[in-house]
Design a protein with these regions (language model features):
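Non-catalytic, well-ordered alpha-helical scaffold segments
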Residues: 9, 30-37, 41, 80, ...
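Acidic-leaning, charged glycine-interspersed low-complexity segments
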Residues: 68-75
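Charged alpha-helical initiation segments
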Residues: 1-29, 138-149
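Short, contiguous, well-structured surface segments enriched in hydrophobic/aromatic residues
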Residues: 31-64
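Amphipathic, well-ordered alpha-helical segments in soluble domains
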Residues: 11-14, 35, 89, 129
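Short, flexible helix-adjacent loops and helix caps
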Residues: 20-24, 48, 52, 98, ...
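Charge-enriched, short contiguous segments at helix-coil
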Residues: 75-149
Length: 149
């Protein structure tokens, strides 16, 4: 898919490097979560802008994913709960307090828990989740998987 995913690729690469060195650094763990989240935000902005004429780049992260998946797939990804948890991790890293954001506010499933701390385990999980979401989205939409994934 070439250069269209440069930001996504670069952010995911940074997230991986940060997560690998996060064992004794909360700052690196937080940065890894933010970079993994940013990689997915870059992807949804790029693909959403190409696929949806009225795509709102300024919308929040989860509503953009919800809109993109509904319009391109007619459904949400199997990884939807992981997207919600990644958003909750990002919020925790930034000091957000309150109810976690949902992909679908009407959902009857319990919302993700917001962790008290963001550490190395959460950083590794965030990077792997971003990789899984990118792979699932490409497979579900019939797009070629990027060679850097």
């Amino acid at each position: 898919m070439g250069s269209e995913h440069d930001s996504c690729r670069e952010l995911l690469s940074v997230a991986y490097e940060l997560a690998a060195g996060a064992t004794d650094s909360r700052g690196r763990a937080v940065a890894a979560v933010l970079a993994a989240h940013g990689a997915l935000e870059a992807l949804v902005n790029k693909v959403g802008g190409e696929e949806i004429a009225s795509f709102n780049y300024r919308a929040r992260f989860l509503p953009k994913w919800h809109d993109l998946c509904e319009r391109t797939l007619g459904r949400q990804l199997e990884a939807a709960p992981d997207l919600e948890r990644l958003q909750a991790l990002r919020d925790a890293a930034l000091g957000f307090r309150g109810e976690p954001e949902r992909l679908d506010r009407r959902s009857l499933t319990p919302p993700p828990e917001i962790p008290a701390e963001v550490g190395a385990g959460e950083a590794r999980w965030a990077v792997e989740t971003a990789r899984r979401v990118i792979a699932e989205f490409h497979a579900a939409t019939g797009r070629e998987l990027p060679d850097w994934l």
